[in-house]
């Protein structure tokens, strides 16, 4: 069985922990408590293959920055999250999060995830955003950002309704597998070049 380390990053309070709890245990906590560090594990079948996903939940707050970075080594794929109803969490993907990941794990694949999908049509949320002259993040905006940061894919999901929730983690596996295939091809290519340059005495 293949093991994959999935590290979940993004601003605090955008639903990262709820997403993981909903996926691993079908439960959601209504109380927000900042995560310092949490680890979940789950087994799943994808494309007729068994996988063991090690899910690392991290704190998004700046004060936990050093601690958060300790979770990064040996990560196979990042789920880089923002809230679809929090425009600042969206803009911070490009302003700070991509830079942090590139500094620490420049070659690790990323799946961009928009959380709290169910709240995009919530009238209270829409009124609150309207007061600030803001709108929820559109699917097209997510796709465009995904391309800009060279992410493997973009997925919108809801921890509450579980819409697209399983797709998030399937995409994480796909990203990891695609990256490893690419690395393997590159290695074979380099080996061929090395053999061509070798002179037998």
Swiss-Prot record:
It is found in: Cell membrane. One of its GO terms (molecular function) is protein kinase binding. A lipid is attached at residue 198 (S-geranylgeranyl cysteine). It comes from the Eukaryota. InterPro entries: P-loop_NTPase, Small_GTP-bd, Small_GTPase, Small_GTPase_Rho. One of its GO terms (biological process) is regulation of actin cytoskeleton organization. Residues 199-201 form a propeptide. Gene3D superfamilies: P-loop containing nucleotide triphosphate hydrolases (3.40.50.300). SMART domains: RAB (SM00175), RAN (SM00176), RAS (SM00173), RHO (SM00174). GTP binds at residues 10-17, 57-61, 115-118. A motif (Effector region) lies at residues 32-40. The modification Cysteine methyl ester is found at residue 198. Keywords: Cell membrane, GTP-binding, Lipoprotein, Membrane, Methylation, Nucleotide-binding, Prenylation. PROSITE patterns: RHO. GO terms for cellular component: cell projection; cytoplasm; cytoplasmic vesicle; cytoskeleton; early phagosome membrane; filopodium; phagocytic cup lip; plasma membrane. It is a lipid-anchor. Belongs to the small GTPase superfamily. Rho family. PANTHER family: RHO FAMILY GTPASE (PTHR24072). This is Rho-related protein racG. It comes from Dictyostelium discoideum (Social amoeba). The gene is racG.
